[in-house]
């Protein structure tokens, strides 16, 4: 009886292995490409960003001070929505509401942990719009409020709901960080 | 301490800068109300990250970071003093070229020996704080350019803008100060057609920026103090960014509707044309009902393929596939979108899955086919085993006949 079954059970096992192997080959291996990109950012008045007392400042950097410049990390969410961060996405820009007061904050959140579908992460979302070579960012959680710098140097980067104000700059240039 | 830090930050954030147009800088320094020993019971807040990098023979201002935009002198219960790290003397006492006004230390003119660390001490009734500011005074030579130049960027073929930086204190003190722009050693006067005045003398416009416009520029402001004129120079390195670096991505495929059989495996490539440039930072990804694929399908029924970049006939493409394994009825009602994005532009293309019933699907046929093969195999094996079993049965019969024969003689 054993002699009779032996060779055919081997064949059956081989067939099953082939099937599973075929199945395994269908699933692609390898890591998913990271969607975070680092950019050099400067406003239309040639000011760049740097940190002072854990606050994002816009100013003019010269000589060795240029190494203080903060690059912006951007993660696209949708066609025109992005998350913005610095320090490799470990600090994220967000719009904070306290009563009627609107403030730009830097929160210690990993940018890759943010999700568009979570309501609490909406404060980190910015709507990006291009006008010619420049880009502006409107907060999704605070509609009508735009990322801005002041004309005067060494003042904090903040949010404004009066983007046409002459002493306010809401337009930025980008360059991929090489 | 944390509350104090927040308070200082808050004060800094909400302070409104006042535009003061004083005719001349007051010569008399603010004398301290009581004798102070610097460093005594003061909280040291650290070093200001930005160093002050200036040229010798020119006026220099150091701004105390502790109260960067408030006028200290207006507060009757607080005052601010400056000292140099290697000296126990307060600044105004032993050096006529230096004086303090508000939160700003003036050095006019600066010499190379003024380089060093300066400490500002902010004191009021309740507390005392200190911070340090680094000053480096360079020789006014070409060798100093890399150390003092501001980096500014303009895009090719656009109207470029140069800004003469960090002149706020001098402009407010000397409103009629004249500013001249130079490229290298060449004065860019009003007759120059390529360079335009922006009205504001601290700005220079470059019409139709070209690669030749890159290089070192200088803006020089004349500053008058006590009847004597000084130059205030800012060096700027202009870099020209080529606009052709980043192409506008064009999504070539997929089609608006993709025919598929339910239960089948489906691969939909999103193919993006990137032009003929050397490199691109374009990223491509899929969305299902505006949700990332990995978030919409955590179990992996639908997955995103690898980012595949390649060239065909000197044209650059990037491809990311959407993989269904298998297609379900749910997919017929889902909006699938491929997005291509780079610093210059974002493009997207919608597509939907449409059921095709007539299409023969191998994966559907595979399961019953396997079953049939197994059944047929089993039957065939049984037949072979039955033959051998038949033989065995015959042998048994013979033995039975033998047993019957001996019993009959009895």
Curated annotation (Swiss-Prot), chain A:
GO biological process, one term: inflammatory response
Gene3D superfamilies assigned to the protein according to its UniProt record, in alphabetical order: 2.80.10.50
Knockout-associated phenotype: Deficient mice still possess other negative regulators of IL1 activity and adapt to excessive IL1 via shedding of IL1R1.
Residues that carry a glycan: 110
Signal peptide: 1-26
A GO molecular-function descriptor: interleukin-1 type I receptor antagonist activity
Record-linked InterPro entries: IL-1_CS, IL-1_fam, IL-1RA/IL-36, IL1/FGF
Entry keyword set: Cytoplasm, Disulfide bond, Glycoprotein, Secreted, Signal
Function: Anti-inflammatory antagonist of interleukin-1 family of proinflammatory cytokines such as interleukin-1beta/IL1B and interleukin-1alpha/IL1A. Protects from immune dysregulation and uncontrolled systemic inflammation triggered by IL1 for a range of innate stimulatory agents such as pathogens.
Annotated protein name in UniProt: Interleukin-1 receptor antagonist protein
Organism of derivation: Mus musculus (Mouse)
Gene name of the record: Il1rn
From Swiss-Prot, chain B:
SMART domains named among the record's database cross-references: IG, IGc2
Segments crossing the lipid bilayer: 356-381
Record keyword tRNA processing present: no
GO biological process: negative regulation of cytokine production involved in inflammatory response; negative regulation of interleukin-1 alpha production; negative regulation of interleukin-1-mediated signaling pathway; negative regulation of protein processing; protein processing
Signal peptide (residue range): 1-13
Extracellular topological domain residue ranges: 14-355
Disulphide connectivity of cysteines: 42-128, 64-120, 164-219, 270-338
PTM section of the record: A soluble form (sIL1R2) can also be produced by proteolytic cleavage at the cell surface (shedding) involving a metalloproteinase.
GO cellular component annotations of the record: cytoplasm; extracellular region; plasma membrane
Domain Ig-like C2-type: 35-136, 146-237, 249-357
Matching InterPro entries: Ig-like_dom, Ig-like_dom_sf, Ig-like_fold, Ig_sub, Ig_sub2, IL-1_rcpt_fam, IL-1_rcpt_I/II-typ, IL-1_rcpt_II-typ
Subcellular location: Membrane; Cell membrane; Secreted
GO molecular function, one term: interleukin-1 receptor activity
Keyword terms: Cell membrane, Disulfide bond, Glycoprotein, Immunoglobulin domain, Membrane, Receptor, Repeat, Secreted, Signal, Transmembrane, Transmembrane helix
Database matches in SUPFAM superfamilies: Immunoglobulin
Record note on quaternary structure: Associates with IL1RAP to form a non-signaling interleukin-1 receptor complex.
UniProt cross-references to PANTHER family, sorted A to Z: INTERLEUKIN-1 RECEPTOR FAMILY MEMBER, INTERLEUKIN-1 RECEPTOR TYPE 2
Similarity comment: Belongs to the interleukin-1 receptor family.
Protein name: Interleukin-1 receptor type 2
Lineage, uppermost ranks: Eukaryota, Metazoa, Chordata, Craniata, Vertebrata
């Amino acid at each position: 009886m054993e002699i009779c079954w032996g060779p055919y059970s081997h064949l059956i096992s081989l067939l099953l292995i082939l099937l599973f192997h075929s199945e395994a080959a269908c699933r692609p291996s390898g890591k998913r490409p990271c969607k975070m990109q680092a950019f050099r950012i400067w406003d239309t008045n040639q000011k760049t960003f740097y940190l002072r007392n854990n606050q994002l400042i816009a100013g003019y950097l010269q000589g060795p001070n240029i190494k203080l410049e903060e690059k912006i990390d951007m993660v696209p969410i949708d066609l025109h929505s992005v998350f913005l961060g610095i320090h490799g996405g470990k600090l994220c820009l967000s719009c904070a509401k306290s009563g009627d007061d609107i403030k730009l904050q830097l929160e210690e959140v990993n940018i890759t942990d943010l999700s568009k579908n979570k309501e609490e992460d909406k404060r980190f979302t910015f709507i990006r719009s291009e006008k010619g070579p420049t880009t502006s960012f409107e907060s999704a959680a605070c509609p009508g409020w735009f990322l801005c710098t002041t004309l005067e140097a060494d003042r904090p980067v903040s949010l404004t709901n009066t983007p046409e104000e002459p002493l306010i700059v809401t337009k930025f240039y980008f360059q991929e960080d090489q | 301490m944390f509350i104090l830090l927040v308070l200082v930050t808050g004060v800094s954030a909400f302070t409104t800068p006042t535009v003061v147009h004083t005719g001349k800088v007051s010569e008399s320094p603010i004398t301290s109300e009581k004798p102070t020993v610097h460093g005594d019971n003061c909280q040291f807040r650290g070093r200001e990250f930005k160093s002050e990098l200036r040229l010798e023979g020119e006026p220099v201002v150091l701004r105390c970071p502790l109260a960067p935009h408030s006028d200290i002198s207006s507060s009757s219960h607080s005052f601010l003093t400056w000292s140099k790290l290697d000296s126990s003397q307060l600044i105004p006492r032993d050096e006529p070229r230096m004086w303090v006004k508000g939160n700003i230390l003036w050095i006019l003119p600066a010499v190379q020996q003024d380089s060093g660390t300066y400490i500002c001490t902010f004191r009021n009734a309740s507390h005392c704080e200190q911070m340090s500011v680094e000053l480096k005074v360079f020789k006014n030579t070409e060798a100093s350019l890399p150390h003092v130049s501001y980096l500014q960027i303009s895009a090719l073929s656009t109207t470029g803008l140069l800004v003469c930086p960090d002149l706020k204190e001098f402009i407010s003190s000397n409103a009629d100060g004249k500013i001249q722009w130079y490229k290298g050693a060449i004065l860019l006067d009003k007759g120059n057609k390529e360079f335009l005045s922006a009205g504001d003398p601290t700005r220079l416009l470059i019409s139709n920026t070209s690669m030749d416009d890159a290089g070192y520029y200088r803006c020089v402001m004349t500053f008058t103090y006590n009847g004597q004129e000084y130059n205030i120079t800012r060096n700027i390195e202009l870099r020209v960014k080529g606009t052709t670096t980043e192409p506008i991505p064009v999504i070539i495929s997929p089609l608006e509707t993709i025919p598929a059989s339910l239960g089948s495996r489906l691969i939909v490539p999103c193919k993006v044309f990137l032009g003929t440039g050397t490199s691109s930072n374009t990223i491509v990804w899929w969305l299902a009902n505006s949700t990332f694929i990995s978030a919409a399908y955590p179990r992996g029924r639908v997955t995103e393929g690898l980012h595949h970049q390649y060239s065909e006939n000197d044209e650059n493409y990037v491809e990311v596939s959407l993989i269904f394994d298998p297609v379900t009825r749910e997919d017929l009602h889902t909006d699938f979108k491929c997005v291509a994005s780079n610093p210059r532009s974002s493009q997207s293309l919608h597509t939907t899955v449409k059921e095709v019933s007539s299409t023969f699907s191998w994966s559907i046929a595979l399961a019953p086919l396997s079953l049939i093969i197994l059944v047929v195999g089993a039957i065939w094996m049984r037949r072979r085993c039955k033959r051998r079993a038949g033989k065995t049965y015959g042998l048994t019969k013979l033995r039975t006949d033998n047993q019957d024969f001996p019993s009959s003689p009895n």
